[in-house]
């Protein structure tokens, strides 16, 4: 049976949530949550390991982006679920070359609708991710390869402007 990336994202979110509440590391938390279906699917495990590895390796950088775009909000005041959805989506946007940023943002919004305790969470997640995405795009920090992954006309325009 094919494992869908949404299922993996949800498991990673649950692992991130667990480490916020318990004294454990992300690998242990994730290990408890993986189903046999995911473990048996090499593509699922590749995506899982890549995404969780990106989050682990770049958590402080990702958190800096979140902090810069959550005006008047201390990171400790952001709901744990929302904060971890933002972390996961930003890791995808920044480090998963084969996933279009809009897919990462849409997945984050849908996961927020499912897991967050308030309807406003999905709007909050959308607003923060959109602002960060626009900054990253303007700064030329999104490196995606392949058809449909990024608007290359905007990237070329930015490249031409910076080379002047």
Swiss-Prot record:
<dbReference type="Pfam" id="PF01029">
    <property type="entry name" value="NusB"/>
</dbReference>
<keyword id="KW-0889">Transcription antitermination</keyword>
<dbReference type="InterPro" id="IPR035926">
    <property type="entry name" value="NusB-like_sf"/>
</dbReference>
<dbReference type="GO" id="GO:0006353">
    <property type="term" value="P:DNA-templated transcription termination"/>
</dbReference>
<comment type="similarity">
    <text>Belongs to the NusB family.</text>
</comment>
<dbReference type="GO" id="GO:0005829">
    <property type="term" value="C:cytosol"/>
</dbReference>
<keyword id="KW-0805">Transcription regulation</keyword>
<protein>
    <recommendedName>
        <fullName>Transcription antitermination protein NusB</fullName>
    </recommendedName>
</protein>
<comment type="function">
    <text>Involved in transcription antitermination. Required for transcription of ribosomal RNA (rRNA) genes. Binds specifically to the boxA antiterminator sequence of the ribosomal RNA (rrn) operons.</text>
</comment>
<dbReference type="GO" id="GO:0003723">
    <property type="term" value="F:RNA binding"/>
</dbReference>
<dbReference type="InterPro" id="IPR011605">
    <property type="entry name" value="NusB_fam"/>
</dbReference>
<dbReference type="InterPro" id="IPR006027">
    <property type="entry name" value="NusB_RsmB_TIM44"/>
</dbReference>
<keyword id="KW-0804">Transcription</keyword>
<keyword id="KW-0694">RNA-binding</keyword>
<dbReference type="GO" id="GO:0031564">
    <property type="term" value="P:transcription antitermination"/>
</dbReference>
């Amino acid at each position: 049976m094919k494992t869908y990336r949404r299922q993996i994202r949800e498991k990673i979110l649950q692992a991130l949530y667990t480490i916020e509440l318990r004294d454990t590391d992300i690998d242990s938390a994730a290990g408890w949550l993986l189903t046999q279906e995911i473990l048996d699917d090499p593509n699922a495990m590749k995506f899982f390991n890549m995404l969780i590895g990106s989050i682990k390796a770049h958590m402080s950088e990702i958190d800096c982006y979140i902090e810069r775009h959550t005006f008047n909000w201390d990171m400790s005041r952001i709901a744990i679920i929302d904060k971890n959805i933002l972390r996961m989506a930003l890791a995808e946007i920044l480090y998963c070359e084969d996933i279009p940023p809009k897919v990462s943002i849409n997945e984050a919004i849908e996961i927020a609708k499912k897991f967050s305790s308030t309807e406003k969470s999905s709007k909050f997640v959308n607003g923060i991710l959109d602002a960060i995405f626009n900054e990253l795009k303007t700064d030329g920090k999104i490196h995606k390869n392949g058809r449909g992954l990024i608007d290359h006309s905007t990237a070329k325009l930015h490249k031409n402007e910076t080379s002047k």
